[in-house]
Amino acid sequence: IYLLLLIALGLSSCQQEKTFKVLQFNIWQEGAVVKGGFDAIADEIVRSNADFVTLSEVRNYHQTRFCDRIVEALRQRGQTYYSFYTEDSGLLSRYPITDSTTVYPLNDDRGSMYKAITHIGDTEVALYTAHLDYRNCAYYDARGYDGNTWDEEPPVTNLDTLAICP
């Protein structure tokens, strides 16, 4: 739900197939509200062996740069990742990032989207990460809450209304 991933791998039929692994990770306030949370995030990234990591809830608390801190923590664990400064959502890549763009900037904690360009061999890869505005999540309707005011309202129980696919 938090991830918009677009990958352009124009591999010709004569090339060997290339694969990569992506981890999408909502790090819940950078792990700051859980004892040992930051280290647990770093350990899970290492355990996943992901080539690309997309992050939700990057906050840059106390004027720090979360992506710089996590890249350093991963380096201390023997892993090399690259990143760039973001707010709210973030990207890590095992491959050097050649370009990055803010697609949708964070505004009043209403979500964000970023794009990174990297290369796997001669193939350009575009990776997007998004953290959507939490106030308009569909599951609030089924639970009987307005995501903007938190007022109770009758839950939406009509299956046709809740259905994503016809």
Question: What name fits each language-model region?
Answer:
Residues 1-2:
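Bacterial N-terminal signal peptides that target proteins for export
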Residues 5-14:
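Hydrophobic h-region of N-terminal signal peptides that target proteins for export
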Residues 13-76, 86, 150-162:
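N-terminal, active-site-proximal structural segment of metallo-dependent hydrolase catalytic domains
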Residues 58-148:
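Structured beta-strand-rich core segments of catalytic domains in phosphoester-bond hydrolases
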